[in-house]
Amino acid sequence: MPFIESMAPLSRAITRGISQFSCYSNTLVLRSSRNSSSSLVKRSYVSSRVSPKKPQHNSDATSSAQKVANKTHTSSVLPGTILKGLCIKAGGVDPVAREDHEYPEWLWSLLDEPAPNSKTARSHARKSAIRAANFLTKK
């Protein structure tokens, strides 16, 4: 039965005209041959991993540890690392990563999801709906 469930994305991909299909260690990767209206954006479809669901544990220790982990912010590179290719000036010097406490606090909240009823979330939903409608129209 798991094999049949894992083939469902492939059958949907065939009906949508997917040009490339590949599977990497239980991950199904589908790439569309169609481009969006913008030349800078190319649509890719990546399905979630095909694996059995793990049982969830409802313990106070786990939830408090997750809250602490969510509040602690760490950068992805070590301090002092030269960030190659991030220089925005021609002939300039590549920036160097700093300690986490040297960055402004608002930087760590840039990638957080907006509140469901906020103006930002509604704007994002509206733009996503427009992009989806434009993608489905014939060109």
From Swiss-Prot:
GO terms for cellular component: mitochondrial large ribosomal subunit; mitochondrion. Residues 35-50 have a biased composition (Low complexity). Keywords: Mitochondrion, Ribonucleoprotein, Ribosomal protein, Transit peptide. Residues 35-74 are annotated as: Disordered. The keyword S-adenosyl-L-methionine does not apply. GO terms for biological process: mitochondrial translation. Its main location: mitochondrion. GO terms for molecular function: structural constituent of ribosome. InterPro entries: Ribosomal_mL54 (IPR013870). Residues 1-50 form a transit peptide. It is found in: Mitochondrion. Residues 58-74 have a biased composition (Polar residues). Pfam families: Ribosomal_L37 (PF08561). Belongs to the mitochondrion-specific ribosomal protein mL54 family. PANTHER family: 39S RIBOSOMAL PROTEIN L54, MITOCHONDRIAL (PTHR28595), LARGE RIBOSOMAL SUBUNIT PROTEIN ML54 (PTHR28595:SF1). Component of the mitochondrial large ribosomal subunit (mt-LSU). Mature yeast 74S mitochondrial ribosomes consist of a small (37S) and a large (54S) subunit. The 37S small subunit contains a 15S ribosomal RNA (15S mt-rRNA) and at least 32 different proteins. The 54S large subunit contains a 21S rRNA (21S mt-rRNA) and at least 45 different proteins. Component of the mitochondrial ribosome (mitoribosome), a dedicated translation machinery responsible for the synthesis of mitochondrial genome-encoded proteins, including at least some of the essential transmembrane subunits of the mitochondrial respiratory chain. The mitoribosomes are attached to the mitochondrial inner membrane and translation products are cotranslationally integrated into the membrane. mL54 may have a meiosis-specific role as it accumulates during the middle stage of sporulation. This is Large ribosomal subunit protein mL54. It comes from Schizosaccharomyces pombe (strain 972 / ATCC 24843). The lineage of its organism: Eukaryota, Fungi, Dikarya, Ascomycota, Taphrinomycotina.
